[in-house]
Design a protein with these regions (language model features):
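N-terminal hydrophobic targeting signals that begin at the initiator methionine
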Residues: 1-2
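Tandem repeat scaffolds
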Residues: 5-6, 11-157
């Protein structure tokens, strides 16, 4: 009996499981794609074109958006905690009510970005970007209850 149980257990453990594998959308053109409300934890969007895509209300913790084109992309109400946004292009992107805590945004381009209610806690941003964001920063993140201005440390620049 032990042998049968052990054999079944070994077979189950060696079967591939999509729930354990992160989704890889790297180097794809996903213009206008609708991922709204999706669980995309750990997904890879490396160098992916997500222009006009809907990623609102998504769980994107630990995802990679390195070099992604996020022009006019809706990321509102999403969890982008610990996300890699290095070298990404955010132009007209909606980050309202988004949690970006502990994310990486080195060499990220930000233009005309909506940030009302966004949480930037522990996100290293160049001072010129912080100054630009502080001009329009307002709101409180509904998930972390932190004020956007406080997370950008607007009072200290």
């Amino acid at each position: 009996m032990r042998f049968i149980i052990l054999t079944v257990l070994m077979i189950v453990l060696t079967l591939p499981s999509s729930s354990f594998a992160a989704l890889d959308y790297g180097k794809q053109s996903l213009i206008g794609a609708d991922f709204s409300g999706s669980d995309l934890k750990g997904a890879t969007f490396y160098l992916t074109d997500l222009q006009d895509a809907n990623l609102s209300d998504c769980e994107l913790q630990n995802a990679t958006l390195y070099g992604a084109k996020l022009k006019d992309t809706n990321l509102s109400n999403s969890n982008l905690r610990e996300v890699t946004l290095d070298s990404a292009i955010l132009d007209g992107t909606d980050l309202s009510n988004t949690n970006l805590e502990d994310s990486f945004a080195y060499s990220t381009q930000f233009e005309n970005v909506k940030i009302q209610g966004a949480d930037f806690t522990n996100v290293f941003l160049p001072k010129d970007i912080v100054r630009k964001f502080c001009e329009s920063a307002s709101g409180t993140n509904p998930f972390t209850n932190r004020d956007t201005r406080d997370t950008l440390e607007c009072d200290y620049i």
